[in-house]
């Protein structure tokens, strides 16, 4: 069940931090700009230890908000109107004093917002996980509300732990304080337009729904590529690595939506029940069936290696690229390789899904490419299906082409919300579908922790060095071939703009 969008105070904890300035406040502003929240029904409060007043916070936020309205003639006016709705409370995170001050600020806001009666509170914790427990305890003891028309909701940011043990410890701290209905664990990939579209694409189209199984699908790829390295943040990244950064969370969420069974309804609990079921069906990750890499200098020497980053410990084995195969032991997917790949400092920046179907029966055609469904999550959302067609003319030769749905070409003047915009709105209306449940989190860490222990142990394998700006480790193509992926056009898909002289 979801709530109607009612009166709220949204408090951003960590208001002076980078995440708040670059993501959280811009997302709330995006909802304001689109009319999803209004000054009459929603007030915004920033909370942090930094000593500043309302105007100083507004001045810090303004440049980031102006970027969103740079093409609008009245953009600055919209930004100023939003910022007039933002106030600031300064205080510590670990003592009651600041929260009591926050409570007094709430009372003043509620006088104008709801004639003095309590309103809903959404607390967005843009903070390190190490302080989640203590901050939540202070919220519960000082500013918690749970009435018919006034509820408390908490959004917490990833990472939700460093491994299975730390994740369970974090949950142990939060569980006595707030119910699952009050907690929203945010994984921003679940707010991306194409990720939210996966269930509609699968279950709303009979041609895909009926072919979505081991009888028809030969291979699935989930790919994350960044064209840049750690750029001076290697010291931070060194403690995380690419697997914790995007694979255990973002890409695993994509995998569950791709492979889960049809839920009974679109109710958030029904969707998350099916995600947990498919997670439990995944076999342990085979430590001998992975590729790990670390980027070196670019082939021309112009781009630095990971170890050239001054913040990186000497001789670090940190993994900046990984590819691994998932096997789902159930009736639908048993035997289908599902390869997850992610890396930094690669040739392009993109996130996409490739579902390659099995070849048609031999006999009529001597050789014909496999059909392939490609779902591009970013940049430039798109879905296209690679199909075989007759080449125009007298011959009966075939050519691969595509049925193409590129969002920018098909949907004009539509607002496609950014991930954080979509998820904050979901939290405001009480929709948990695109947030991570406690048991889901536990199963995902149970799947990845043995692999991480192996890769970070005393006998950890050496990552393969690959060139900055390349496609990744040289053994990647052979790895994909071994997992049933059939490349076309010299291993790189060519967009099908075909002319007679190119035959």
UniProtKB/Swiss-Prot annotation:
GO terms for molecular function: glucose-6-phosphate dehydrogenase activity; NADP binding. The active site is at residue 250. NADP(+) binds at residues 14-21, 49, 158. Keywords: Carbohydrate metabolism, Glucose metabolism, NADP, Oxidoreductase. PANTHER family: GLUCOSE-6-PHOSPHATE 1-DEHYDROGENASE, GLUCOSE-6-PHOSPHATE 1-DEHYDROGENASE G6PD. Belongs to the glucose-6-phosphate dehydrogenase family. This is Glucose-6-phosphate 1-dehydrogenase. It comes from Hanseniaspora uvarum. The lineage of its organism: Eukaryota, Fungi, Dikarya, Ascomycota, Saccharomycotina.
């Amino acid at each position: 069940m979801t709530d109607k969008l009612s009166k709220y105070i949204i408090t951003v904890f960590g208001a002076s931090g980078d995440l708040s300035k670059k993501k959280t406040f811009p997302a709330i502003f995006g909802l304001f700009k689109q009319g999803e929240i209004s000054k009459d029904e929603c007030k915004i409060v920033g909370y942090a230890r930094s000593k500043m007043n309302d105007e100083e916070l507004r001045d810090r936020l303004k440049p980031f908000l102006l970027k969103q309205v740079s093409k609008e003639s009245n953009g600055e006016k919209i930004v100023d109107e939003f910022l007039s709705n933002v106030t600031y409370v300064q205080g510590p995170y670990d003592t009651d004093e600041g929260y009591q001050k926050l409570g007094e600020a709430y009372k003043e806001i509620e006088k104008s917002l709801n004639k003095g009666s309590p309103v809903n509170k959404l607390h967005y914790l843009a903070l390190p996980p190490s302080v989640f427990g203590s901050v939540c305890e202070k919220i519960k003891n000082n500013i918690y509300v749970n009435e018919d028309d006034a509820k408390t909701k908490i959004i917490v940011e990833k990472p939700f732990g460093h491994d299975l043990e730390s994740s369970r410890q974090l949950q142990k701290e939060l569980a006595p304080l707030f119910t699952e209905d009050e907690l929203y664990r945010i994984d921003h990939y679940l707010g991306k337009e194409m990720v939210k579209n996966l269930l509609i694409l699968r279950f709303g189209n009979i041609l895909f729904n009926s072919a979505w199984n081991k009888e028809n699908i030969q291979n699935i790829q989930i790919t994350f590529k960044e064209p840049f390295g750690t750029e001076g943040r290697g010291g931070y990244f060194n403690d995380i690595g690419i697997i914790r950064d995007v694979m255990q969370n973002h890409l695993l969420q994509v995998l569950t939506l791709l492979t889960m069974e049809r839920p009974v309804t679109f109710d958030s609990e029904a969707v998350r029940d099916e995600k947990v079921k498919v997670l439990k069906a995944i076999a342990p990750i085979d430590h001998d069936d992975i590729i790990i890499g670390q980027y070196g200098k670019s082939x021309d020497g112009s781009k630095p290696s990971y170890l050239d980053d001054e913040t990186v410990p000497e001789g670090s084995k940190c993994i900046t690229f990984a590819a691994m195969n998932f096997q789902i032991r159930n009736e639908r997917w048993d035997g289908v390789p599902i390869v997850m790949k992610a890396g930094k400092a690669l040739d392009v920046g993109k996130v996409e899904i490739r579902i390659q179907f099995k070849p048609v029966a031999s006999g009529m055609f001597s050789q014909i490419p496999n059909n392939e469904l490609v779902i591009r999550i970013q940049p430039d959302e798109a879905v296209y299906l690679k199909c075989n067609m007759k080449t125009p003319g007298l011959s009966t030769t075939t050519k691969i082409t595509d049925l193409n749905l590129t969002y920018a070409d098909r949907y004009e003047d539509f607002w496609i919300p950014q991930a954080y915009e979509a998820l904050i709105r979901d939290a405001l209306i009480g929709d948990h579908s695109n947030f991570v449940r406690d048991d889901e989190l536990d199963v995902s860490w149970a799947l990845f922790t043995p692999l991480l222990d192996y890769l970070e142990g005393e006998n950890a394998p050496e990552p393969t060095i690959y060139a900055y700006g390349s496609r990744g480790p040289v053994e990647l193509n052979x790895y994909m071939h071994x997992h049933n992926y059939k490349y076309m056009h010299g291993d790189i898909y060519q967009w099908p703009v075909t002319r007679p002289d190119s035959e």
